[in-house]
Amino acid sequence: MHDFVYVTRKSAKPVRDELIQIIHEVQNLVEDYFTFQFRPVGSSSMNMITFDQKSNIGFDFDFDLGINDEEENYSPDEIRNIMRNAIDQVAPRYGYKHCEDSTRVLTIKKVNIFNSTIEHSCDFALVYNCEDEIQQYIRFNKKNGNYTWEYQSKGFKNLNNKIVWLKQNRLWGELQDYYIDKKNRNNNPDKHSRSILAESINEMYQKKRG
């Protein structure tokens, strides 16, 4: 059992500002290849960032990096490599380790070398936004070592409408408690905060809406 609690806006803001500065520098580095937009997603966009008081792992942020390559000049592995190399040029200057390449995201971590704790981390998903809230992301297939564009699961669709409904019906506080409980009970280290939050929103919406 974990012991997750919410991070205050005051604590999260300087880290968020630093990550945005890193993203701006990455945009400058890759502009000869393609451009991209960014936006915080998941708990990062809803003031629901958490950290586990029982672990040595700090809080985490999530950003979507929307790649503009409509003519498909670059393959998924080329895009991922260009982005990873650019992030690796910038992030270490701010005290972060080099990127970790996981199935859905590129992750950077700021580690306190004196006590071997992770102060905070950030997951970058490389995405393409289609119509009707449908989104693709670059997936790293670890078994065969290749990269492909894949559609996000249906659980991420129409989340904004469900969030609006929950807020209008004064269920946001209940959702926050539900999300923390799910995080505390999660034993899958590969399940990221963004997925747990999407599950929480969908489950709460279905339960209350009927």
Task: Annotate each language-model stretch with its function.
Residues V26-G42, P92-I108, R185-I201, K208-G210:
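Short glycine-rich, low-complexity/disordered patches
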Residues V30-F61, L65-N73:
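Active-site nucleotide-donor binding segment shared across nucleotidyl transfer reactions
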Residues V105-L106, N115-G210:
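Right-hand nucleic-acid polymerase module
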Residues L29-Y33, R80-D132:
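Conserved catalytic core of two-metal-ion nucleotidyltransferases
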Residues E18, I22-E25, I82, A86, ...:
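Charge-rich, solvent-exposed alpha-helical interaction surfaces
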Residues K10, P14-D17, Q21, Y74, ...:
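Alpha-helix boundary/N-cap detector
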Residues M1-V41:
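Helical scaffold of the NTase/Pol beta-like nucleotidyltransferase catalytic core
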Residues F63-Q89:
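A broadly used, surface-exposed interaction patch
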